[in-house]
Amino acid sequence: MVKAKSWTLKKHFQGKPTQSDFELKTVELPPLKNGEVLLEALFLSVDPYMRIASKRLKEGAVMMGQQVARVVESKNSAFPAGSIVLAQSGWTTHFISDGKGLEKLLTEWPDKLPLSLALGTIGMPGLTAYFGLLEVCGVKGGETVLVSAAAGAVGSVVGQIAKLKGCKVVGAAGSDEKIAYLKQIGFDAAFNYKTVNSLEEALKKASPDGYDCYFDNVGGEFLNTVLSQMKDFGKIAICGAISVYNRMDQLPPGPSPESIIYKQLRIEGFIVYRWQGDVREKALRDLMKWVLEGKIQYHEHVTKGFENMPAAFIEMLNGANLGKAVVTA
């Protein structure tokens, strides 16, 4: 019998998550039924959305999340043993699936690319960058794009796609190491928002003429400050608000209606799962092509060991990761 280890939500987070909010449980899995497959996790993802999505979990439930898994036993002809799949199995080492919701990797996945990229640049974060920038912001060559949390899994891809499309790109991140990385991957300007004397002045210095598109990963005061720097008819794609996810005190005031009205801005929140079918498939192929051609570079922040899932999650929320945070099982 196979034993599965799972990290469960022991209690809902109060402010910043802590190790004591999680509990590691072990269960014995039953034999497979017809149509089922047994999955073994290879790589697991930790992402900012889990912080707010966890509010919908019942205490004691397995933490949600995506993983790259190997089919180790199968009674489902669509997923023979040895297949590599993407699964929404959560924080667990082994999982029995009926095959629904499993996704095979692109058939032409080359051996030289790590499978973990299916959780990052050629996966959900990459798709988020792709559709948020190209569909929500609808960027065109010659425009100026601002990205917050620019050295993260999503932001780093946003900036590189924007450069591919002929845009000027400005990134904000929270350490000098991250700023150096942004310049290495082609950002035109980047600044450490934690050390600048004035965020408003830093934004003006990076692009005196303002911004056509702002890809927002942080929300809060940063978003409010950016509004006055937007060009008329500018577009803002609201992807996340990691700066306020852990706050227990009163949230900062919302965006200024005056700036939105008189600049005639368009602000749109979005979830990547809006785009499915052929457009999603094309986006994945575009991302893989750009990675293989060296037009999109990637960096992974890898934590070894399933036992370290909570620590990896907490570190990611604290901004310790450069690029995509993944855990090896």
Curated annotation (Swiss-Prot):
Protein EC: 1.3.1.48, 1.3.1.74
GO function terms (MF aspect): 13-lipoxin reductase activity; 15-oxoprostaglandin 13-oxidase [NAD(P)+] activity; 2-alkenal reductase (NADPH) activity; leukotriene B4 12-hydroxy dehydrogenase activity
Residues the record lists as binding NADP(+): 152-155, 178, 193, 217, 239-245, 270-272, 321
Residues found modified as N6-acetyllysine: K178
Catalytic EC class: oxidoreductase
Tissues and organs where the protein is expressed, per its UniProt entry: Detected in small intestine, kidney, liver, spleen and stomach (at protein level). Detected in small intestine, kidney and liver.
GO BP, sorted A to Z: leukotriene B4 metabolic process; lipoxin A4 metabolic process; prostaglandin metabolic process
Subcellular location: Cytoplasm
Keyword Cytoplasm: yes
PTM annotation (Phosphothreonine): residues: T18
Primary localisation category: cytoplasm
UniProt entry tagged with the keyword Lipid metabolism: yes
Modified residues (N6-(2-hydroxyisobutyryl)lysine): K178
Pfam families registered for this protein in UniProt: ADH_N_2, ADH_zinc_N
Record GO cellular component, one term: cytoplasm
Quaternary data: Monomer or homodimer.
Protein role: NAD(P)H-dependent oxidoreductase involved in metabolic inactivation of pro- and anti-inflammatory eicosanoids: prostaglandins (PG), leukotrienes (LT) and lipoxins (LX). Catalyzes with high efficiency the reduction of the 13,14 double bond of 15-oxoPGs, including 15-oxo-PGE1, 15-oxo-PGE2, 15-oxo-PGF1-alpha and 15-oxo-PGF2-alpha. Catalyzes with lower efficiency the oxidation of the hydroxyl group at C12 of LTB4 and its derivatives, converting them into biologically less active 12-oxo-LTB4 metabolites.
PANTHER family recorded: PROSTAGLANDIN REDUCTASE (PTHR43205), PROSTAGLANDIN REDUCTASE 1 (PTHR43205:SF7)
Protein name, entry field: Prostaglandin reductase 1
Organism, as annotated: Cavia porcellus (Guinea pig)
